[in-house]
Amino acid sequence: MAKQTPLYDQHVACGARMVDFHGWMMPLHYGSQIDEHHLVRQDAGMFDVSHMTIVDLHGNRTREFLRYLLANDVAKLTQPGKALYTGMLNESGGVIDDLIVYFLSEDYFRLVVNSATRDKDLAWISQHAEPYQVEVTVRDDLALIAVQGPQAQQKVATLLTTEQQQAIAGMKPFFGIQTGDLFIATTGYTGEAGYEIALPKQQVVAFWQQLLAAGVKPAGLGARDTLRLEAGMNLYGQEMDEKTSPLAANMGWTVAWQPEDRQFIGRAALERQRMKGTEQLVGLIMTEKGVLRNELPVYFFDAAGNQHVGVITSGSFSPTLGFSIALARVPAGIGEHAVVQIRNREMPVRVTKPGFVRAGKAIVL
């Protein structure tokens, strides 16, 4: 039977259409996915993301452990509260998961990992933590709400104490701080400003209702997916998985090659891939009528006139732009134009960098 977050009854009360999402009953939408999407781009919306897993790591070798476990380098994290995005790789360079890691103190780091990969993530982390004597604590006592949009931070501030407001004042993106019972982070999955807020499960219903009263409306998984696609953000299981290199998933920027003597899991495989070359993740735009969908083939000719084929990993109509967009994994050598096979029609598409909307504005037109 699918699990429920502490906010399940709140979703039902808000009129949500509930669906099974990787073993969790989650809201797909509350009546209109399009309206929820626009709300986040133009004002503020909130998402229940309590199905995600928060993992706390304690021990005096935690930093050393994470420098081995993760492709990005936590040595970059010198200011308490600072966070970074990274892949956690297997020995063959495939992506076990993508996650955010927060540096809270020299013997205390926090990870936030995906719900679909929870069991294998925890097994992998625990297995590799043992030699470093790092204590792994799964924070199932916490719930998580993402409040996103240009008005999100302003509306959240109305619910905070003076001390909490002062604690987060001027906090830059990719930071997190514990203030009172709230862990407030300037992270998100929409391309908008906002917060992701972790708090004790027994307090989350009251906090959700306070957000509603402050004018923050709920948004479901449908809007979350179109928002992250417009922002060019990966979804685990589509843009990357255990057989996909981060170099082929627009995650090369998250791999810290320096210093050269840092050995991390998957490094040797990635170095071979870097020498040999990999596929790449690109953006696609189709302004003609129709919708780019996952798994449709993408055809193009390289400079030498050879035809290549790739595949759409995520595709949808873009509510912000008013036409169809996609992320696609393709062989190297693609130019500015390609063709997507939709049923029996070959539809022309424009090739872009993977990212279409930032802070509510188009960045591809």
UniProtKB/Swiss-Prot annotation:
Cited InterPro entries? GCS_T (IPR006223), GCS_T_bac (IPR022903), GCST_C (IPR013977), GCV_T_N (IPR006222), GcvT/YgfZ/DmdA (IPR028896), GcvT/YgfZ_C (IPR029043), TrmE/GcvT_dom1 (IPR027266)
The lineage is: Bacteria, Pseudomonadati, Pseudomonadota, Gammaproteobacteria, Enterobacterales
The reply on keyword Transferase is yes
For the keyword Repressor, the answer is: no
The EC number(s) attached to this protein equal 2.1.2.10
Assigned GO CC terms: cytosol; glycine cleavage complex
Protein's recorded name: Aminomethyltransferase
Per the UniProt entry, the signal peptide is none
Chain's gene name? gcvT
Q: How does it assemble?
A: The glycine cleavage system is composed of four proteins: P, T, L and H.
Question: What is the catalytic activity of this protein?
Answer: N(6)-[(R)-S(8)-aminomethyldihydrolipoyl]-L-lysyl-[protein] + (6S)-5,6,7,8-tetrahydrofolate = N(6)-[(R)-dihydrolipoyl]-L-lysyl-[protein] + (6R)-5,10-methylene-5,6,7,8-tetrahydrofolate + NH4(+)
Which GO biological-process labels does this protein carry? glycine decarboxylation via glycine cleavage system
Query: What keywords would UniProt list here?
Result: Aminotransferase, Transferase
Organism superkingdom: Bacteria
Query: Cross-referenced Gene3D superfamilies, in alphabetical order?
Result: Aminomethyltransferase beta-barrel domains, Aminomethyltransferase fragment, Probable tRNA modification gtpase trme, domain 1
Among Pfam families, the record links this protein to: GCV_T, GCV_T_C
Q: State what this protein does.
A: The glycine cleavage system catalyzes the degradation of glycine.
Q: Which family does it belong to?
A: Belongs to the GcvT family.
Which GO molecular function annotations are given, in alphabetical order?
aminomethyltransferase activity; transaminase activity
Which PANTHER family does the record cross-reference, listed alphabetically?
Answer: AMINOMETHYLTRANSFERASE, AMINOMETHYLTRANSFERASE, MITOCHONDRIAL
